[in-house]
């Protein structure tokens, strides 16, 4: 790895990325090394194929959807800033930072609301602001695989949408999604401890 260095100053726009993501310099340096390791051809960016080589994503039923979140608007190249930005959603919430946060500043990427927005977009494939019954069925099918019959899966889907759908339109809006997850500790469930 001769040309690859471990100095923080080599990361393009490091200060901007640090402010946007909330990552410490040490965490950014670790992420940058991971980014470089995934960039086997030293192109300076990652492709979908590079991310598909990550074992945890390869076996995750939502792996393809998670990978899609790294490539917004049909982009084909993922630079380090985008890589760090998506991973920032999974950064644990630091209670001290939350209490000291300037309300005039944008909400941190790892806030409860932003974690929920990230999760919502994994379901809302057509980006219409609602999770349709069909979208919910697709996600549940990915998650349970062949462990349940199609009939059971249809029933689970109908019940899930029905319980969350407060306005009776047959779909789950973002507001309904957040209300349905009020009691869930999303801050913990959507955090990766190594991402501080």
Curated annotation (Swiss-Prot):
Chain sites annotated for binding Ca(2+) 2: 165, 167, 169, 176
Binding site for Ca(2+) 1: 124, 126, 128, 130, 135
Localization per Swiss-Prot or TrEMBL: Cytoplasm; Nucleus; Cell membrane
Single GO cellular component term: plasma membrane
Chief site of localization: cytoplasm
Gene Ontology terms for molecular function: calcium ion binding
Sequence positions bearing Phosphoserine: 27
SUPFAM superfamilies found in the cross-reference section: EF-hand
Family in the record: Belongs to the calcineurin regulatory subunit family. CHP subfamily.
Quaternary structure and interacting proteins, as annotated: Interacts with PPP3CA. Interacts with SLC9A1/NHE1; the interaction occurs in a calcium-dependent manner. Interacts with SLC9A1/NHE1.
Transcription is among the record's keywords: no
Domain named EF-hand: residues: 26-61, 71-106, 111-146, 152-187
A GO biological process held by the record: regulation of pH
Matching PANTHER family: EG:114D9.1 PROTEIN-RELATED
Keywords: Calcium, Cell membrane, Cytoplasm, Lipoprotein, Membrane, Metal-binding, Myristate, Nucleus, Phosphoprotein, Protein transport, Repeat, Transport
Motif Nuclear export signal, residue numbers: 137-148
UniProt-listed PROSITE patterns: EF_HAND_1 (PS00018), EF_HAND_2 (PS50222)
Lipidation, N-myristoyl glycine type: 2
Role: Functions as an integral cofactor in cell pH regulation by controlling plasma membrane-type Na(+)/H(+) exchange activity. Binds to and activates SLC9A1/NHE1 in a serum-independent manner, thus increasing pH and protecting cells from serum deprivation-induced death. Also plays a role in the regulation of cell proliferation and tumor growth by increasing the phosphatase activity of PPP3CA in a calcium-dependent manner. Activator of the calcineurin/NFAT signaling pathway. Involved in the cytoplasmic translocation of the transcription factor NFATC3 to the nucleus.
SMART domains: EFh
Domain of life: Eukaryota
Name of the protein in question: Calcineurin B homologous protein 2
